[in-house]
Amino acid sequence: MTRRLVAGLPTGTSAWRQRVAGAAAGLQVGAAVQLDFVLPPGRWVDGDTLAENTLKGLRDGGALPARYGGLDALVATKRDGGVPGVQVTTLTPKTVEGRRAPGPAALDVTASLLPRPGRRDVKRAWRSQLAAAWRDRPPLEGSLWADVAMPVSGSLIAPLEVVLDALEPVLGRDPRGRAWQEFFPNDHLITWLRVRRGATGAALRLRIGVR
């Protein structure tokens, strides 16, 4: 296990990506990583956006190969207060899998869909399955956790947007979304996210609940 602290304000910008790349010298992430973000109070940003941009910085800095090859598991957390930054911790997939979710699951759903970036039809089908599973319950509120297992062979990160963007039936719509933006859920409420690579042919699985 190796830890590396990157100070600064985590964002989805190129400036943050460059800061992470500059701090990545000598670090090798391997098959699993945990990213613990600290943000100023009231900062409104999706955890998966922070995670993806930070991983890009780690890749740029040589800590990860192209397309995040070999990365099979990720945990990303965010909290308000304290000195802004991210702590990068290298782990093993077994360690990540052994972590207990920080609360009971309000929804546990599987699907035979294979999430692919740019496939709006898949995203719509996944959203329909989530709506059917959630039924007419009110959206989840507060600090949330999500656990995603995806049967993908390529990048573990690229398909994640497809999975999370369809969560509007469960999380409600983010008021920042404009009318033309079809997918804009309140996924900024997710403060603990685990993403794992599932076996080829396995089902896509999402569990989500309140922390």
Task: Place the predicted regions along the sequence by residue.
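Acidic, proline/glycine-enriched N-terminal capping motif
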Residues: 1-211
